[in-house]
Amino acid sequence: MSIVFALSAISKSFGKNNQVNIIINANLQIKKGEIVALIGPSGSGKSTLLHIAGLLDTPSSGSVFINNIECSATTSDREKTYLRRNFLGFVYQFHHLLQEFSVLENVMLPQIIIGKSNEVARKNAIELLSLVKLQDKLLMSISQLSGGERQRVAIARSLINYPSIILADEPTGSLDNDTALEVFSLLHKYAKEKNISVFLATHNHILAKKADKIVQINSGTLQNYTDY
């Protein structure tokens, strides 16, 4: 199976003279359609690594490869924006949905941004909202939804441009266990059906065990996790 995403010798340091090492020489390959869970204690560098993976933060050294396109500290903001919009999907613990927009408009927005017509964007958004079982709430405002429903909207939005990989940073962290499992199951099912890769940072070991592979970060070091 082809590699669609890779981290190569990623390091990240902060502070005067880069004295504080957050990520130390992280290497990872994710195959097409593979779901990889990232676990580790609070403050271990999970979110920092996800932000670097999503081209939202710049590593001190090393490269990110997305569909064999290399991104490093010298990659332009314009190229990073292109890659984010066309190959990456994002789901966060705090969804960043637009409160003044309807459910349907929130999911349509990424397609409008890349130049799709309203008709095409609407059709694709309705299809995905049906997938996450929100077809009867298309015109509702975000404020009218429960926490679990909002995360389902966020998942639909992350899928709308058919990304190569979804980066999910604690996507169910604010939900109760039953709702978290329901939301993650929807993401897992669609990713497997469409052969989309997922890189998931989570504290929830029940969700992590549903991944194809688990990696652990501790004190900035990334390693395979085999203690199922």
Swiss-Prot record:
Localization in the cell: Cell inner membrane
Residues that bind ATP: 40-47
Alphabetical keyword list: ATP-binding, Cell inner membrane, Cell membrane, Membrane, Nucleotide-binding, Translocase, Transport
Pfam families registered for this protein in UniProt: ABC_tran (PF00005)
GO molecular function annotations of the record: ATP binding; ATP hydrolysis activity
Record-level GO cellular component terms: plasma membrane
Enzyme class: translocase
Alphabetized CDD domains for the sequence: ABC_MJ0796_LolCDE_FtsE
Quaternary structure and interacting proteins, as annotated: The complex is composed of two ATP-binding proteins (LolD) and two transmembrane proteins (LolC and LolE).
Function: Part of the ABC transporter complex LolCDE involved in the translocation of mature outer membrane-directed lipoproteins, from the inner membrane to the periplasmic chaperone, LolA. Responsible for the formation of the LolA-lipoprotein complex in an ATP-dependent manner.
Similarity section: Belongs to the ABC transporter superfamily. Lipoprotein translocase (TC 3.A.1.125) family.
Protein name per UniProt: Lipoprotein-releasing system ATP-binding protein LolD
Species in which this protein is naturally found: Ehrlichia ruminantium (strain Gardel)
Lineage, uppermost ranks: Bacteria, Pseudomonadati, Pseudomonadota, Alphaproteobacteria, Rickettsiales
Protein's gene: lolD
